[in-house]
Structures are given as C-alpha cells and as structure tokens.
C-alpha cells in the first residue's frame, strides 16, 4: 500500500499555499512539481500541515488545520495531528479519530489560517 506523504504551508510573501516537503527546521517547503529542479519557498512554519491521506466527499485532500462539516451538522470540526494520528475536534474538544468518520459525509469548508472567522463561529 502506497501512502502519499505531503505537506502544505503558506508562503511568507504573498500568502500562497505551497505543497511539497518541508526542510528539517520547517522554515521552507520544496515544491516537487518539477522533480528536475524543485523550487524552495519560505513559509510560515505555523501554517505547515500534513496531508491525512484522507479525501472529503468532493475528493479534496484533508490536511491538519482544515475545517469541515460532517453531513447535515451545522457545527464545524477542526483537523489536528496529535499523538501520531489525525483527530477531529469540536468546540475545542476531541470528537474522534478522523479515519473513523464516514468520509462520504465530510466536506472541507476552509482552514484555520485562511478562515479565522470560522474559528470564532466554532467556539461560540
């Protein structure tokens, strides 16, 4: 079984999302779109998140830091990577392991970096 190991991070200049592998100090990400000459981007280390290897119902990759809805629930869940696994948090409390939820009902609606206003709604 082949697992895709992928990270994302937001560039310090421009705030663009870069996908690839981070350096050991999590200050840069190598974008591996061009394997002959990968580009290296300085990123905000707080925004670096690991791909969970799980896709939502729209075939969108789910990363640590993403926010999602679960079915018809109005609440938003946050994805965190802790203790070696991806966890779903609801209103700041652990709800469950991401891989145990029915992904056909998960829809990523944003992330904690681009959509901080959604965090306020989550925690109210």
Q: In which residue ranges do the predicted regions lie?
A:
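Secondary-structure transition motif
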Residues: 1-124
